[in-house]
Amino acid sequence: NLYQFGNMIQCANHGRRPTRHYMDYGCYCGKGGSGTPVDELDRCCQTHDDCYGEAEKLPACNYMMSGPYYNTYSYECNEGELTCKDNNDECKAFICNCDRTAAICFARAPYNDANWNIDTKTRCQ
């Protein structure tokens, strides 16, 4: 779920950047997404959005409150290393891996302050 995703981001980047800095970045980090990603970090968000889209198509994720935004999965954070636990069902495992992959991607990608809170109407066509 989104709360766990935020915690994964903090784990992967060792708390160096607040999660809220990723909520309104580029064309894809935050609610919605369109156009061409502005940089590597924005591509991480586009990939994460696409992964959630795939999760929503899974039969195992096709029931009320089972989607990627609400479903609670089991994972572990150990000194920046993220592990999705084996006790997750198919849907939870898929969502956990979407979030894990994105959190690692965020931690590796450079953050450009100029791409925070951009005018998406003009920059994300």
Curated annotation (Swiss-Prot):
Q: Name one GO molecular function term.
A: calcium-dependent phospholipase A2 activity
Enzyme Commission designation: 3.1.1.4
Disulfide bonds, which pairs? C11-C77, C27-C124, C29-C45, C44-C105, C51-C98, C61-C91, C84-C96
Q: Localized where?
A: Secreted
Would the keyword Repeat be found if you checked this record's keyword annotation?
no
Gene Ontology CC annotations of this record = extracellular region
Q: Which residues form a coiled coil?
A: none
The note on the cofactor says:
Binds 1 Ca(2+) ion.
Q: Which cofactor is essential here?
A: Ca(2+)
Q: Which positions are catalytic residues?
A: H48, D99
* Key words of the record: Calcium, Disulfide bond, Hydrolase, Lipid degradation, Lipid metabolism, Metal-binding, Myotoxin, Neurotoxin, Secreted, Toxin
Q: Which family does it belong to?
A: Belongs to the phospholipase A2 family. Group I subfamily. D49 sub-subfamily.
Q: What is this protein called?
A: Acidic phospholipase A2 HTe
